[in-house]
């Protein structure tokens, strides 16, 4: 009796707890689904609660109707869609082999599927009929693990028969990755012309040079012996030659081809490609599908900068973050070594390095500008700025590049210059209302924004916007903190102001606060602060993430090799692969690099156009790097 009273008392617990804990909790088991499967398998093994018999090739297989209906659309429609099979104890299954049906039922009860060369085809046929995507994917993956040049056409036919787009894409990828070797086989010439045309048009075609594409196009129609012996007719060029991007071929190769061709459409095409090479200054304005790199590898890239330790070898090396390895690699030597804080812009996948600090025997403002072409690993010196600009910012708006303010180490500047790649010339546009240097800028929605910087000895928190349509500057709301030698990035409809330093504490300190400006609300806010100081950082945006590269930390009293990556969705910073050296003043951007580069050793010295002999001799006499306290920041 006493026990019953105690239990009754427990049942009277208040449903209004006196503390602030949640009234309800939801619990989720991570083991329940597997336990349920094990229980169903035990029922099957024991022959308990079967309620349907599948008749396949005249043989009977007992099963549980509810599990079949839950496993795929085919059985769900059969047993829960109002069909006559809902009431039948025996159901006839057509077009599926008994062995394949056993395989599929084993998967339904266990989530395991054993495939072999002897059963994969009939299992795939059954999975397609019964509409079980997971098994279809497993079969396709298994087939791909056995694909070679001898059986690839058979697998293509299987993919076409069952409309397996994923398998077709995997087969295409196999050929794209092994194109040079595969193009020398008989199976290559048995592919449909439309398929080969599509493959040769792809940016994912893995070749070391465009000449291999040209040869591959010929090998579809001619044998290797005929191609090597030049026993081919190009008066009426094969259609596949339309896919060859002749401007990507080396000029010497094009010239040899041009010289041996008679009057023909192909000769005209080659002549146009030669003109592309000869008009080097105008190449950015001559871009089209046939000048596009065969690559979809967008990489964070850095140029120049100052190292904390003497290094004449690394000072002129550009570096990129290899997305396959997750580490930094060197890929080209710069035409202008020992430069830092250069303005950087990317237009039509050409990199422009504008002005900046010439770090030879001290610091001086630079007016010279360079352009890098990753298609041919080639540098070209473009028209110089009309005046020297150090500690400037550079932005692309539309088809123009803008170099904004800065200083020449005699005066602070307000001048703004605009570069037109079509004419290789600079012209002045509307200047800023006041001088500024060590500011940062970026482009959003067709307008250019600059923030903060210095004027004389004062740190600023100003924000200005340039409208190229009206050639006017507008002043916007001040940012939340003064800073200079920082970076900016545009992401979605917001501007981010990152890093830098100020002397609000009475001495130079890092600014960790990251400010965010909404162009919609025209309001400033703060987001997750930087985990470390980044003055004079490189800034790049890739896949909606902001990369902050190296820089100077005044709190630590040193340059850094840190890389921090901002995730806007999570509002957090992650550590990225560190730079190989502590470096500040790195000019960073995002660039599409050749696919072959990611799989090979660093390139050697690039081709150089309009090399400056005086500048080269000047570099040859350079002593070690300046120490940390001898920097453009003062």
From Swiss-Prot:
Q: Which residues form the BTB domain?
A: 50-117
In residue numbers, the region (Disordered) covers 600-634
Give me the stretches of Acidic residues compositional bias.
Answer: 624-634
Query: Pathway listed for it?
Result: Protein modification; protein ubiquitination
The main location is cytoplasm
The UniProt entry, under Gene3D superfamilies, shows: 1.25.40.420, Kelch-type beta propeller, Potassium Channel Kv1.1, Chain A
Single Gene Ontology MF annotation: ubiquitin-like ligase-substrate adaptor activity
* Chain positions found as Phosphothreonine: 463, 475, 605
Question: Its domain of life?
Answer: Eukaryota
Listed GO CC annotations: centrosome; Cul3-RING ubiquitin ligase complex; cytoplasm; cytosol; lysosome; mitotic spindle; nucleus; polar microtubule
What keywords are annotated for this sequence in UniProt? Acetylation, Cell cycle, Cell division, Cytoplasm, Cytoskeleton, Kelch repeat, Lysosome, Mitosis, Nucleus, Phosphoprotein, Repeat, Ubl conjugation pathway
Single GO BP term: protein monoubiquitination
Q: Which CDD domains match?
A: BACK_KLHL22 (cd18461)
* Location of N-acetylalanine modifications: 2
Q: What does this protein do?
A: Substrate-specific adapter of a BCR (BTB-CUL3-RBX1) E3 ubiquitin ligase complex required for chromosome alignment and localization of PLK1 at kinetochores. The BCR(KLHL22) ubiquitin ligase complex mediates monoubiquitination of PLK1, leading to PLK1 dissociation from phosphoreceptor proteins and subsequent removal from kinetochores, allowing silencing of the spindle assembly checkpoint (SAC) and chromosome segregation. Monoubiquitination of PLK1 does not lead to PLK1 degradation.
Quaternary organization: Component of the BCR(KLHL22) E3 ubiquitin ligase complex, at least composed of CUL3, KLHL22 and RBX1. Interacts with PLK1. Interacts with DEPDC5 (via DEP domain); the interaction depends on amino acid availability. Interacts with YWHAE; required for the nuclear localization of KLHL22 upon amino acid starvation.
Name listed for the protein in its UniProt record: Kelch-like protein 22
Q: What is the lineage of its organism?
A: Eukaryota, Metazoa, Chordata, Craniata, Vertebrata
């Amino acid at each position: 009796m006493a026990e019953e009273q105690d239990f009754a008392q427990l049942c009277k617990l208040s449903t209004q707890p006196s503390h602030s804990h949640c009234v309800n909790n939801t619990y989720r088991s991570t083991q329940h689904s597997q336990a349920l499967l094990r229980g169903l398998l035990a029922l099957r093994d024991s022959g308990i609660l079967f309620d349907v018999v599948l008749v396949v090739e005249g043989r009977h297989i007992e099963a549980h109707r509810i599990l079949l209906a839950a496993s795929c659309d085919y059985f769900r429609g059969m047993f829960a869609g109002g069909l006559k099979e809902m009431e039948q104890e025996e159901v006839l299954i057509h077009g599926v082999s008994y062995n394949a049906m056993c395989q599929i039922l084993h998967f339904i009860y266990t989530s395991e599927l054993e495939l072999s060369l002897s059963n994969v085809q009939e299992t795939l046929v059954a999975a397609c009929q019964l509409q079980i995507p997971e098994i279809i994917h497993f079969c396709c993956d298994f087939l791909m693990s056995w694909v070679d040049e001898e059986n690839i056409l058979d697998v293509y036919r299987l993919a076409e028969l069952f409309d397996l787009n994923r398998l077709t894409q995997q087969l295409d990828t196999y050929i794209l990755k092994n194109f040079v070797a595969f193009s020398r086989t008989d199976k290559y010439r048995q592919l449909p012309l439309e398929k080969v045309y599509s493959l040769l048009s792809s940016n994912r075609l893995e070749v070391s040079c465009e000449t291999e594409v040209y040869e591959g196009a010929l090998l579809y129609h001619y044998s290797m012996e005929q191609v090597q012996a030049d026993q081919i007719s190009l008066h009426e060029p094969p259609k596949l030659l339309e896919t060859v991007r002749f401007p990507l071929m080396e000029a010497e190769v094009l010239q040899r081809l041009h010289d041996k061709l008679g009057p023909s459409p192909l000769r005209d095409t080659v002549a146009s490609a030669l003109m592309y090479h000869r008009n080097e200054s105008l190449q950015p304005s001559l871009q089209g599908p046939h000048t596009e790199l065969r690559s979809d590898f967008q990489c964070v890239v850095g140029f120049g900068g100052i190292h904390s330790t003497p290094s004449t070898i690394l000072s002129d090396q550009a570096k990129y973050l290899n997305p396959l390895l997750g580490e930094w690699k060197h890929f080209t030597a710069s035409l202008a070594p020992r430069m830092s804080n250069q303005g950087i812009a990317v237009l039509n996948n050409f990199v422009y390095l504008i002005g900046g600090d010439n770090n030879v025997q001290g610091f001086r403002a630079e007016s010279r500008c360079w352009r890098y072409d990753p298609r041919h690993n080639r540098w070209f010196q473009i028209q110089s700025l009309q005046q020297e600009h150090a500690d400037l910012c550079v932005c692309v708006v539309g088809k123009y590049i803008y170099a904004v303010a800065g200083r020449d180490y005699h005066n602070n500047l307000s001048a703004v210059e605009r570069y037109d790649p079509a004419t290789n010339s600079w012209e002045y546009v509307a200047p800023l209302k006041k001088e500024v240097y060590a500011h940062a800028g970026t482009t959003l929605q067709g307008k250019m924004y600059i923030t903060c910087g210095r004027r004389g000895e004062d740190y600023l928190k100003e924000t200005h916007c340039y409208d190229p349509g009206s050639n006017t500057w507008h002043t916007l709301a001040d940012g939340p903190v003064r800073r200079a030698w920082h970076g900016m990035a545009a992401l979605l409809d917001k501007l981010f102001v990152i890093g830098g330093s100020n002397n609000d504490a009475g001495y130079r300190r890092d600014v960790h606060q990251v400010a965010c400006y909404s162009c919609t609300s025209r309001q400033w806010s703060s987001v997750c602060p930087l985990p470390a100081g980044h003055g004079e950082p490189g800034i790049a945006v890739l896949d909606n993430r902001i990369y902050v590269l190296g820089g100077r930390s005044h709190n630590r009293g040193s340059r850094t090799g840190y890389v921090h990556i901002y995730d806007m969705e999570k509002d957090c910073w992650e550590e990225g692969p560190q730079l190989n050296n502590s470096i500040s003043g790195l000019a960073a951007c995002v660039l599409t690099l050749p696919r072959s580069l990611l799989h090979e050793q660093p390139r050697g010295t690039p081709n150089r156009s309009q090399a400056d002999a005086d500048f080269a001799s000047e570099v040859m006499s350079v002593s070690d790097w300046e120490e940390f306290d001898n920097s453009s920041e003062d």
